[in-house]
Amino acid sequence: MQLRRSNQYTFESKVRYSETDLERKLTLPAIINYFQDASTFQSEGFGLGIEYCAEHKKAWFLSSWQIVVERYPELGEVIDISTWPTGFKGMFGDRNFILEDKEGDILAWANSLWIYMDLEKGRPTKPSEEVIDAYGQSAPLDKEFAPRKIDVPSEFTVMEPVQVRKYQIDTNGHMNNCQYVAVAMEVLEDNERFTQFRVEYKKSAVYGDILIPKIAKEEDRTIVVLCDEEDKEFAVVEFR
């Protein structure tokens, strides 16, 4: 059972059929969506959500995250999803997430790094004291956090290209964070189930962009790099 933090946001849900896989377990993209929803709900509750960002021409962009799944919840299981900011430094903000069962056991957790962007100037900027004070800061999870950058192998197998579809675009006009992982998972073998994931976002894909997945398998991990047609990276996804 986790102690509730002063700036923690929590909402309850039930695992839906539309969120499950062949084994009736919650999928990784669904876990990611729950975590994203939690941070969005908290921002909206603070008055710092989509409308605030549009008015002030600011936005939080996800730079990287590490997700660890202890157990995939099953169809119909009641779950709690929580998030809280853990610190701010310059243009960066750190945020933790947990997904718990009704007994308070952690089923999945994540550590993430976000960049605050000035959309008018097209560059990172430091969030105002108003924003920092509203979010607050609490201690991070007592977990071993992986570094932000993912080591990329030199040799890959190039897979079939994928075009970004309309349904993959979010309110920022970019491909949603979850969709990069969903595309990367398509090149994995069907019987593979991983419990640790890292994603490093390099640049945003937009509607119509071509993503070329490149996969490399090592002894203890699988790396999928999503590149454009000039071999520039959109995202690096690591599965363990």
Give residue ranges: language-model regions.
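Acidic/His-leaning functional-site neighborhoods
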Residues: 156, 162-238
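HotDog/MaoC-like acyl-thioester-processing domains
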Residues: 2, 6-11, 66-70, 74-150, ...
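Exposed loop/turn and edge beta-strand positions of beta-sandwich/beta-sheet ligand-binding modules
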Residues: 63, 93, 195
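Hot-dog-fold acyl-thioester-processing enzymes
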Residues: 1-62, 105, 109-111, 118-192
